[in-house]
């Protein structure tokens, strides 16, 4: 039995996102290199009332990088009618890649891409695995799973979406433990490999069906198999000694950064 997933983005929403990105380029005098969907729509289990979490990477004109004082390296747009839009400047994004930031790595693996500069994004996707740190990724995902489990799943009635916000990072950590490298962003791809128990798979699919048909705030009774699986998995975690820290070449990031900033394709 395969796991349910969906990535609902209508043509109207896609057009709104592209219009917003073009407006950001005009207002901030930047070039958007890459824009994707993060959050539950990217993970494949959005509720009908889920926001659209649009994340992007952008680059300024060369002169912007010549100032003595550091300048703001994020662009944030107030949430408006379901659209939550925010982006990171390219140098910031590459610094985070150097530190194996899981959030950036997930953006680059998103199943929903609104815009991309093919050459630049292809290079970023090629560089990302060379900087992936199993230790940092595992710590990030286990911390997220434990925090959500302690904070939201201790009562008899629980906020159902939080099970998925625990399961996904927990399975991502197990994916890393299995030596599979960077975890996939889509939850169904992750669970299909990491969950073998048939009754547990069935219960997770029931949870996915409820999540994808209900509001973000839906509460309900505990899912006993999922709950027991999470408790046992969190209790059993121990850090293996041979985890790879990530060993990419910073000079490759510098070369890519220089070439991208100096590229003659910035809109006038």
Model-identified regions with their sequence ranges:
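Short loop/turn segments at secondary-structure transitions that flank enzyme active sites
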Residues: 60-63, 100-103, 147, 172-173
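Conserved NTP-donor binding/palm subdomain of two-metal-ion nucleotidyltransferases/polymerases, i.e.
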Residues: 20, 30, 95, 260-261
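A basic- and aromatic-enriched beta-loop-alpha substructure that forms the phosphate/nucleotide-
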Residues: 67-144
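Acidic, carboxylate-rich catalytic segments that either coordinate divalent cations
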Residues: 244-268
